[in-house]
Amino acid sequence: MHRYFQIAAALFLATSFALAPAIAYDTELSDTAVREAYFLGQRNDDKTRAFFVPYTKHLSVPKKGPYISEIRLLTPLAQVIQISSQTTSGYSAQQARLDYQQRGDSLLLVVHIEFTPTYGQIEAAQASGDASKARGITLRPDDFWQSFRYGIKQKADWIDPKVIRGEAEYGGADSFGRGGLVGAWVYVEYDAHNVISNDVDVSVFTPSGEEIQTSFDLTKLR
């Protein structure tokens, strides 16, 4: 009988470890976890930046087309730290907790698109008899990022996003106070409970159909 219980206990532990990767990473954050994340964000120093290293991928400049320069995958904890680091004036730990409760447990995919010499603010240009009038020139719209597709998958299964939003990015203003469009930041939000703590493949598809890929190991993220 004693031998039976030893075997049963061993099987239970083996099963538990086998299921471990499917258990969500840090969700349902405690007040203490949110508070510690808040203070790490408020530091906004080398320690804060070091935290985000495994959450960020920097990609190479393509030979042509738009430049997907940066991809981030932020867990609920990482989002608390990021928001705190961006709101250092008049932002309290209590507000960080309220913001987290309102936001819920989400996984945030962040994509930075930058223009290049072959994919810029001018979308198309047609021949014109009077070049000085610049006829036939079409400027890329502020919401150009909507012509891209974004997604994450695990074991070939795509995960449905909750929300997709984007923000146009502008360059320095000229003498008339106008700044040109230079890119965009795109934010894709997922329910963290739909993403297991395992490898995640990220894909960004350009308007021309090119796929830019990277991956993250959620077992190494908090």
Annotate each predicted stretch with a short phrase.
Residues 8-18:
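Bacterial N-terminal signal peptides
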